[in-house]
Amino acid sequence: MNSIQFPLLDRTAPNSVISTTLNDLSNWSRLSSLWPLLYGTSCCFIEFASLIGSRFDFDRYGLVPRSSPRQSDLILTAGTVTMKMAPSLVRLYEQMPEPKYVIAMGACTITGGMFSTDSYSTVRGVDKLIPVDVYLPGCPPKPEAVIDAITKLRKKISRELYEDRIRSQRANRCFTTNHKFHVRRSIHTGNYDQRVLYQPPSTSEIPTEIFFKYKNSVSSAELVN
């Protein structure tokens, strides 16, 4: 390179050369390519469907909904999760490639909602099954809140370090596909209903004369019929 070209190089270098690290480049490439797997089971998912319209422009963040967990890196759970659905949710999460993220949308997903008070089949929070990155409360959350949750997740991704990501992949494993749910005895024995329900007297408490008299009358009625 001769000396005549140096002034031109000095003028164009600040605008054409970018100094960065491999970690920042990896985070930047994933910010606008989050492909979510939509796991909607209740009314919260109806609010999420509003994002697909032109008013909120769901595609401007690079979010492309996928139907296969092997092509997704974000799972968005919305609605109640029951014990019967829990193994399926865990299996979907395990089939997603790394790095992967979870957004819990709605009160029913975060705490079980109104179904967790006396329901024996409702999971009290999806974070008992899979690790959650962003909690989105509401019943149901508005579409603006969903966009805010996605923005916060993008900020979290932009600050990640490669070493911390590998460490979290090994630590944030609540359950695996080999986990089996054991059926335990119910704590609801129904003893509180014994005072209200009518308890028929046993045959030992009925006098012998009345018992045989009732039995003979039933037998004669059966013979007549």
Swiss-Prot record:
<keyword id="KW-0408">Iron</keyword>
<comment type="similarity">
    <text>Belongs to the complex I 20 kDa subunit family.</text>
</comment>
<dbReference type="GO" id="GO:0051539">
    <property type="term" value="F:4 iron, 4 sulfur cluster binding"/>
</dbReference>
<dbReference type="GO" id="GO:0048038">
    <property type="term" value="F:quinone binding"/>
</dbReference>
<keyword id="KW-0813">Transport</keyword>
<dbReference type="GO" id="GO:0015990">
    <property type="term" value="P:electron transport coupled proton transport"/>
</dbReference>
<keyword id="KW-0479">Metal-binding</keyword>
<protein>
    <recommendedName>
        <fullName>NAD(P)H-quinone oxidoreductase subunit K, chloroplastic</fullName>
        <ecNumber>7.1.1.-</ecNumber>
    </recommendedName>
</protein>
<keyword id="KW-0618">Plastoquinone</keyword>
<comment type="function">
    <text>NDH shuttles electrons from NAD(P)H:plastoquinone, via FMN and iron-sulfur (Fe-S) centers, to quinones in the photosynthetic chain and possibly in a chloroplast respiratory chain. The immediate electron acceptor for the enzyme in this species is believed to be plastoquinone. Couples the redox reaction to proton translocation, and thus conserves the redox energy in a proton gradient.</text>
</comment>
<keyword id="KW-0150">Chloroplast</keyword>
<dbReference type="GO" id="GO:0019684">
    <property type="term" value="P:photosynthesis, light reaction"/>
</dbReference>
<dbReference type="Pfam" id="PF01058">
    <property type="entry name" value="Oxidored_q6"/>
</dbReference>
<keyword id="KW-0934">Plastid</keyword>
<dbReference type="GO" id="GO:0009060">
    <property type="term" value="P:aerobic respiration"/>
</dbReference>
<keyword id="KW-0793">Thylakoid</keyword>
<keyword id="KW-1278">Translocase</keyword>
<feature type="binding site">
    <location>
        <position position="44"/>
    </location>
    <ligand>
        <name>[4Fe-4S] cluster</name>
    </ligand>
</feature>
<keyword id="KW-0521">NADP</keyword>
<keyword id="KW-0874">Quinone</keyword>
<keyword id="KW-0520">NAD</keyword>
<comment type="subunit">
    <text>NDH is composed of at least 16 different subunits, 5 of which are encoded in the nucleus.</text>
</comment>
<dbReference type="GO" id="GO:0008137">
    <property type="term" value="F:NADH dehydrogenase (ubiquinone) activity"/>
</dbReference>
<keyword id="KW-0004">4Fe-4S</keyword>
<feature type="binding site">
    <location>
        <position position="108"/>
    </location>
    <ligand>
        <name>[4Fe-4S] cluster</name>
    </ligand>
</feature>
<dbReference type="GO" id="GO:0045271">
    <property type="term" value="C:respiratory chain complex I"/>
</dbReference>
<dbReference type="InterPro" id="IPR006138">
    <property type="entry name" value="NADH_UQ_OxRdtase_20Kd_su"/>
</dbReference>
<dbReference type="InterPro" id="IPR006137">
    <property type="entry name" value="NADH_UbQ_OxRdtase-like_20kDa"/>
</dbReference>
<feature type="binding site">
    <location>
        <position position="139"/>
    </location>
    <ligand>
        <name>[4Fe-4S] cluster</name>
    </ligand>
</feature>
<dbReference type="GO" id="GO:0009535">
    <property type="term" value="C:chloroplast thylakoid membrane"/>
</dbReference>
<keyword id="KW-0472">Membrane</keyword>
<feature type="binding site">
    <location>
        <position position="43"/>
    </location>
    <ligand>
        <name>[4Fe-4S] cluster</name>
    </ligand>
</feature>
<keyword id="KW-0411">Iron-sulfur</keyword>
<dbReference type="GO" id="GO:0005506">
    <property type="term" value="F:iron ion binding"/>
</dbReference>
